[in-house]
């Protein structure tokens, strides 16, 4: 990890083959072929009119990855991921399709409700440049990563694993917020100047793969992925994580939010991943003074037409929000309507998982 000008750059363990050169003040990518493949032609001693001895292969002549070992490295990483997650019973990705619906907060409190049932729970904060789980869970600066090696991020000789910090109630948490101060950002370096958008997804998922294969997950009942917002991002994570991962979607009683989540449902339905259902978050707010649920949005019930099961409706509780801001996770759910709603969602989630 390199820090420069307030930015954090991660060096990944996967090599992508291309090397970058500068020509006419512009970034240019050129392949680095292995010996025995093609090489730039050189003029023979016979002069300019002589026949060139080496012919450059065309696109359709190249077999495999051109000697970069990308395919081999991807296969090796997949093996590390499979081995690393061998002790995890259920993988559940929590997505929203739209930001601002309280997905990360719900993920943490749902993890708390599951943990209160005696289950072994971990959270992977997959929003690398907008991590929030570290602060909410109270584990900022608590993650130690072994020095990188040729075998990958956080892996020293292939034997050292990243040990995760835990909340006061025993939830293991991986979040970039435990590594990167809030005043700094995570950057994915590009091989071509001004073209970082074409490389970002590749780099980001390579990093996710390294994390999955390098962390000591151990024996878990559930690993919850807190996904970044965006309908397209949700589908990308489904494709990367594979059919073993089930999805739980979060929305609020708003027509706008419902419409975006409906797009996520439509896109996920085309793939092999199972959609467990959705949670209607912030269905109202809990008034401690009057001990009642008050309306928060005007669109109550607008999200009920998603075509997937509703696992529950969770009202907003200002007290829980204050706990998150201070990084004080609740050791056990309070006896409030919010706590009972979260416990209901946890039970419905477990029932859905067990019915697979």
Which residue stretches match the model-derived regions?
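Extreme N-terminal, non-catalytic leader segments
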Residues: 29, 38, 44-97, 142
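Switch II (G3) loop of P-loop NTPases
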Residues: 178-202, 207-236
């Amino acid at each position: 990890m390199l820090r420069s000008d307030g930015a954090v750059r991660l060096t990944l363990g996967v090599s992508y083959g291309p090397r970058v050169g500068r020509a006419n003040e512009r970034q240019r990518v050129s392949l680095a072929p292995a010996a025995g493949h093609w090489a730039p032609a050189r003029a023979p001693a016979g002069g300019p009119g002589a026949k060139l001895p080496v012919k450059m292969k065309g696109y359709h002549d190249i077999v495999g990855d051109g000697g970069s070992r990308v395919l081999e490295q991807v296969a090796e990483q997949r093996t590390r991921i499979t081995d690393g997650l061998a002790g995890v019973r259920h993988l559940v990705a929590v997505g929203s399709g739209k930001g601002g619906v309280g997905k990360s907060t719900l993920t943490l409190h749902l993890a708390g409700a599951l943990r209160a049932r005696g289950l072994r729970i971990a959270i992977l904060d997959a929003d690398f440049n907008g991590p929030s789980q570290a602060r909410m869970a109270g584990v900022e600066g608590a993650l130690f990563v072994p020095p990188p090696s040729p075998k990958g991020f956080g892996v020293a000789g292939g034997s050292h694993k990243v040990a995760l910090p835990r909340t006061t109630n025993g939830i293991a948490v991986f979040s970039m917020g435990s590594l990167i101060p809030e005043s700094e950002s995570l950057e994915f370096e590009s091989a071509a100047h001004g073209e970082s958008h074409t490389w970002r997804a590749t780099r980001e998922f390579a990093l996710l793969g390294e994390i999955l294969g390098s962390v000591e997950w151990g024996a878990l009942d559930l690993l919850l992925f807190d996904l970044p917002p965006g309908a397209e991002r949700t589908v990308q994570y489904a494709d990367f994580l594979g059919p073993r991962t089930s999805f739980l979607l979060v929305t609020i009683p708003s027509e706008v939010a419902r419409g975006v989540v409906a797009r996520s449902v439509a896109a996920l339905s085309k793939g092999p991943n199972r959609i467990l259902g959705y949670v209607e978050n912030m269905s109202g707010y809990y008034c401690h003074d009057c001990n009642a649920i008050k309306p928060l949005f005007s669109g109550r019930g607008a999200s009920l037409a998603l075509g997937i099961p509703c696992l529950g409706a969770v009202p907003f509780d200002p007290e829980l929000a204050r706990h998150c801001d201070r990084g004080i996770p609740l050791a056990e759910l309070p006896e409030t309507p919010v706590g009972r709603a979260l416990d209901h969602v946890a039970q419905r989630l477990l029932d859905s998982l067990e019915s697979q």
